[in-house]
A protein has these predicted regions:
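Short secondary-structure junctions
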Residues: 512-515, 670-680, 723-728
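Solvent-exposed, membrane-proximal periplasmic/extracellular interface segments of envelope transport
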Residues: 55-58, 62-72, 565, 682, ...
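Inter-lobe coupling/hinge segments of SF2-like helicase ATPases
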Residues: 198-204, 208, 212, 222-660, ...
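Short amphipathic beta-strand starts and helix->beta connectors
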Residues: 4, 627-637, 674-688
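Solvent-exposed residues in well-ordered beta-strands and their adjoining turns
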Residues: 8, 23, 652-654, 703-705
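Short amphipathic alpha-helix segments
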Residues: 624-625, 660-682
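A carboxyl-terminal module marker
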Residues: 672-693, 718, 731, 735
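Accessory, non-ATPase domains that flank or precede helicase/AAA+ motor cores in DNA-metabolism machines
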Residues: 1-363, 375-391, 673, 709-741
Length: 741
């Protein structure tokens, strides 16, 4: 028998099958989905490969498969092949997403094991020897007395409780009294979580209506997609919990996806308090490779029926899915920005169609495309218009910063926001200040000649970080010393422009010195568990003001927060992206939703230089429907998704001549192949950020509704490019990417 394998390498020219003989002794082990080791080319080391087909004979002279490692299912291999075509990547890259973490030879993880101690002789026999005085050592006697009551203890435990040494234990082993047995232990990311159990809540009429409609499809094993559209605080999570309970009753598995930034202790604790941690597995990037390895095993063995995770948890190794829930479905993190550039929402839909179960997409600010599908009845809309605990939506006020400047206020806090913070402090209530930009100042400029400090590797301004007293590039991580004189004109008129979270923290501490503050952004949560520690401090340690980027918006419930201030609502408007209005509306609505979530009324103050922008105005009114009507009309007029697909083909490299010639080849190839009546194919041009990490960046854009032939044309083009032996240029395609930059 012959196995058709894909070599586990990212090179585009290896995105094809190679034939290998299946030796007689491996015939029962090799199936479609097997990971195998094979000799490849002239290399002396074996390569990992994936079996994607089996046939009787080959027309080539073939080598033998050397070893079988582990298996994926035929269903997973079919999904990987579909993904490779859809997302313009190698099959092997897709298979990796579904493979067990920690099984690569370079980074192989093994089961974690410890030695535990058991009595080798019968207890009665040991009792006789202790009483007869045969065992004279007091420490040996203490160790045996302890083990009579505590068999399975570790060496450290025996030593700690009996004050004996390893040498004493070795003597007992040598004399046949005890034995050391190796025991596997799980690396459990939830091991320190002790949560009080909670009971399910009584659903409101709106919640019950939504629950019943989704539960009907669970009971009937039927595929259907639902948009659970509910205002912030409307109780979507309680519906998720009660749906998962119904899936558990059927003995099936639930997958709950949340944005990585929302995978907070608070989110996970709600599930543990309802279902316990034994039945729960968590998958996200902050886990160690060993923890991911053990959580994956727990799922594979059927010991976890509830899986909570970020985007990649959609590939959890389970065949008995009863529901997939995608919370905050509008979040951009559900689309991968590195190869394979897949959409977790699209994968969920494919899995559900083939597995006959429902998908629930939850959001207070749905993705425009999702809401459009609901309006066209392609998915079922379920609406929650009221907050679950009868708390009112917060009052939202817009402050025009142009007017503040005209009145002489140059502070980062408008008069209204300053007064509300002071009032909150007197009332012993908490405040959140939001700015979607970290650092101290966003750029440094010489006022004499206009020089701007830019990264030496990227064509982008450096950001000043006050606490480290350094300039940092947020694209490549490059750091340099702070400038005191201009390198161009030698002037000392260096000024810091823009505002980041560090600067807000410093300014607030100056303006309101009696307030206690804490900051949460990428710089302060880089260590494991630091995210949790900051939130716990804010919640429990009488901290008055939390300052942060969008990570403070997601997955948190602070009962004592009654004021939210948005420092600069324009940040997300000033980007080169057709979704700028949508993202601005979403983030402002989500931020506003943090205020007044209990009985206390909430206030939100949005500071902006563009008070008349419709996305800011309608975020103040929290009117998604009107926002959608305006935005969808603009998209229809300008032909943007959902009225077409956008494909960006990116070129990056160090040799400008080769890069431009490669981009021209791709343009001419696709221009000649694709139907110009159906597709707008734009010529390659430098990207808006035309250099990152010392690599030149170009892009070309294709707009149109993708068909099977269009996917085929682009995939063939990419294969042809890599067969041309380009040395200094990388080319890739992305459909409906997160960023147009």
């Amino acid at each position: 028998m012959i196995a058709e394998v894909i070599i586990d390498r990212a090179a585009k020219k290896l995105n094809r099958t190679f034939d290998y003989n299946i030796p007689k002794d491996l015939e029962d082990l090799v199936i479609i989905g097997s990971t195998v080791l094979v000799p490849f080319g002239n290399s002396k080391t074996l390569e990992e490969a994936y079996v994607i087909g089996i046939k009787e004979t080959s027309s080539f002279e073939v080598k033998d498969i050397a070893k079988v490692k582990h298996n994926l299912s035929d269903k997973q291999i079919r999904l990987a092949k579909w993904m490779a075509k859809k997302y313009f990547c190698n099959v092997s890259e897709c298979i990796k997403l579904m493979s067990q973490p920690g099984t690569k030879r370079k980074h192989e993880v093994k089961d974690k094991k410890i030695n535990v101690i058991y009595l080798k002789k019968e207890i009665e026999e040991i009792e006789i020897e202790l009483q007869s005085g045969k065992i004279k050592s007091e420490k040996q006697r203490r160790a045996l007395e302890f083990l009579k009551e505590n068999e399975g203890a570790t060496s450290n435990e025996v030593e700690m409780f009996t004050d004996c040494s390893k040498a004493i234990l070795k003597t007992l082993e040598k004399n046949g009294y005890i034995e050391f047995i190796e025991k596997k232990i799980e690396r459990d990311p939830l091991q320190n979580k002790e949560i009080t159990k909670t009971e399910k809540l009584k659903l409101t009429e709106e919640q019950e209506n939504a629950f019943n409609k989704i539960n009907k499809t669970i009971q009937e094993n039927k595929y259907e997609e639902f948009l659970l559209y509910g205002v912030t605080g409307s109780g979507k999570t309680e519906i998720y919990l009660q749906l998962i309970e119904k899936v558990l009753e059927k003995g099936k598995t639930s997958i709950m996806l949340v944005p990585e930034i929302s995978l907070t202790p608070q989110t996970i604790n709600r599930f543990i308090s309802r279902f316990g941690k034994e039945n729960l597995a968590v998958l996200h990037s902050k886990l160690s490779i060993g923890e991911r390895y053990d959580e994956w095993n727990k799922i594979k063995q059927g010991n976890a029926k509830i899986i909570i995770g970020a985007r990649s948890a959609i590939f959890a190794p389970t065949d008995d899915i009863g529901i997939i829930i995608i919370d905050e479905e509008h979040d951009s993190s559900y689309k991968s920005e590195s190869s394979p550039r897949y959409s977790a929402k699209e994968i969920a839909s494919i899995l559900a169609k083939h597995g006959d179960f429902p998908v629930v997409l939850g959001s207070a600010t749905p993705d425009i495309t999702t809401y459009y599908k609901a309006q066209k009845n392609e998915i079922t809309m379920l609406e929650l218009t009221k907050r679950a605990n009868n708390s009112t939506l917060p009052q939202v006020q817009i402050v025009d910063l142009k007017q503040e400047l005209a009145e002489g206020n140059r502070s980062i806090l408008s008069t209204a926001l300053y007064e509300e913070i002071e009032k909150n402090l007197k009332d012993k209530k908490q405040t959140i200040l939001f700015l979607n930009r970290r650092g101290f100042s966003t750029f440094i400029m010489c006022r004499e000649c206009g020089y701007t400090a830019k990264c030496k590797n990227c064509n982008i301004s450096m950001t000043y970080h006050r606490f480290e007293n350094k300039l940092k590039c947020h694209y490549c991580g490059c750091e340099q010393k702070v400038l005191t004189t201009c390198p161009e004109c030698k002037s000392n008129k260096i000024r810091y422009f823009g505002t980041g979270t560090q600067k807000i923290e410093e300014e607030v501490n100056k303006i309101i010195p009696n307030a206690t503050t804490i900051r949460m952004d990428v710089d302060t949560v880089s260590k494991k568990n630091s995210h949790e520690e900051i939130l716990e401090k804010f919640k429990n340690e009488n901290i008055d003001i939390l300052i942060g980027t969008q990570m403070i918006v997601k997955g948190h419930h602070f009962p004592n927060v009654t004021l939210v201030g948005v420092i600069a609502a324009d940040t997300s408007l000033n980007i080169d992206d057709y979704r700028a209005n949508e993202r601005t509306f979403q983030i402002l609505t989500q931020v506003a939703g943090r205020a007044g979530r209990e009985k206390l009324p909430g206030n939100v103050i949005i500071q902006t230089y563009n008070p008349d922008n419709f996305s800011i105005d309608l975020a103040q009114k929290q009117d998604y429907n009107e926002f959608f009507d305006i935005e969808i009309a603009l998209r229809r007029q300008l032909k943007y998704p959902p009225f077409c697909d956008i494909i960006i083909i990116s070129f990056t490299g160090t040799n400008e001549k080769e890069l431009i010639s490669t981009s021209e080849y791709v343009y001419k190839y696709l221009d000649s192949k694709m139907d110009k009546q159906k597709y707008n194919i734009f010529r390659p041009v430098p990207s808006p950020i035309d250099k990152i990490q010392n690599k030149i960046r170009w892009r070309m854009i294709i707009k149109g509704n993708m068909t099977v032939k269009a996917y085929q044309d682009i995939n063939e083009c990419l294969t042809n490019v890599y067969s041309k032996n380009i040395k200094h240029t990388k080319v890739w395609a992305d459909i409906n990417p997160n960023s147009m930059i």
